[in-house]
């Protein structure tokens, strides 16, 4: 009985080594099986803006307006704000463009998209929506900053 037990424990690593060096491959799905939808399930895409609850934008109320400093190689005064969204979450959002009229209790819309050199800021405020006006005298990339088309006269 003892010798049988010892032979089983000694053979297990040998069998594992044989399996590693085996020339036969594992079975793969045929084209018909793939067409039918079998195989490993697709991994779900992880949201980069989880606080928005799968929505493209969320309305929110500004709690406070902040001026933040960026990470090491950059130097600036970046404008951001804390926003309480309609789903109850509180997020930090970057205010793009030059100059803004956001203040406490302003109604703003928040979209996903992080500000790369501000740690913890993973959302952008949408200019030209809600109480936040668009950037004045903006000529290029106006749609990103909520600016109207300048008049020709």
UniProtKB/Swiss-Prot annotation:
Entry keyword Ribonucleoprotein: yes
Database matches in InterPro entries: NA-bd_OB-fold (IPR012340), Ribosomal_uS12 (IPR006032), Ribosomal_uS12_bac (IPR005679)
GO terms under cellular component: mitochondrial inner membrane; mitochondrial small ribosomal subunit; mitochondrion; ribosome
GO molecular function, one term: structural constituent of ribosome
Broad class of the protein's primary localization: mitochondrion
CDD domains, alphabetized: Ribosomal_S12 (cd03368)
One Pfam family per UniProt: Ribosom_S12_S23
Localization terms from the record: Mitochondrion
Keywords assigned: Mitochondrion, Ribonucleoprotein, Ribosomal protein, Transit peptide
Transit peptide start and end: 1-20
GO biological process: mitochondrial translation; translation
Family affiliation: Belongs to the universal ribosomal protein uS12 family.
Additional observations: Present with 238 molecules/cell in log phase SD medium.
Assembly, per entry: Component of the mitochondrial small ribosomal subunit (mt-SSU). Mature yeast 74S mitochondrial ribosomes consist of a small (37S) and a large (54S) subunit. The 37S small subunit contains a 15S ribosomal RNA (15S mt-rRNA) and 34 different proteins. The 54S large subunit contains a 21S rRNA (21S mt-rRNA) and 46 different proteins. uS12m forms part of the decoding center of the mt-SSU.
NCBIfam families registered for this protein in UniProt: rpsL_bact
Function as written in the Swiss-Prot or TrEMBL entry: Component of the mitochondrial ribosome (mitoribosome), a dedicated translation machinery responsible for the synthesis of mitochondrial genome-encoded proteins, including at least some of the essential transmembrane subunits of the mitochondrial respiratory chain. The mitoribosomes are attached to the mitochondrial inner membrane and translation products are cotranslationally integrated into the membrane. uS12m is required for respiratory growth.
Name of this protein: Small ribosomal subunit protein uS12m
Taxonomic source organism: Saccharomyces cerevisiae (strain ATCC 204508 / S288c)
């Amino acid at each position: 009985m003892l010798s049988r037990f010892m032979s089983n424990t000694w053979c297990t690593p040998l069998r594992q080594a044989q399996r590693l060096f085996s020339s036969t491959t594992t079975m793969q799905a045929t084209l018909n099986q793939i067409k039918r939808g079998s195989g490993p399930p697709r991994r779900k895409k992880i949201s980069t803006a989880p606080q928005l609850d799968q929505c493209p934008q969320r309305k929110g109320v500004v709690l406070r307006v902040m001026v933040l400093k960026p990470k090491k190689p950059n130097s600036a005064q970046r404008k951001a704000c804390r926003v309480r969204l309609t789903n109850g979450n509180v997020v930090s959002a970057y205010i793009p463009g030059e100059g803004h009229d956001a203040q406490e209790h302003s109604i703003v819309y928040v979209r996903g998209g992080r500000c790369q050199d501000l740690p913890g800021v993973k959302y952008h405020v949408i200019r030209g929506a809600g109480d936040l006006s668009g950037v004045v005298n903006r000529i290029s990339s106006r749609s990103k900053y909520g600016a109207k088309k300048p008049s020709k006269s």
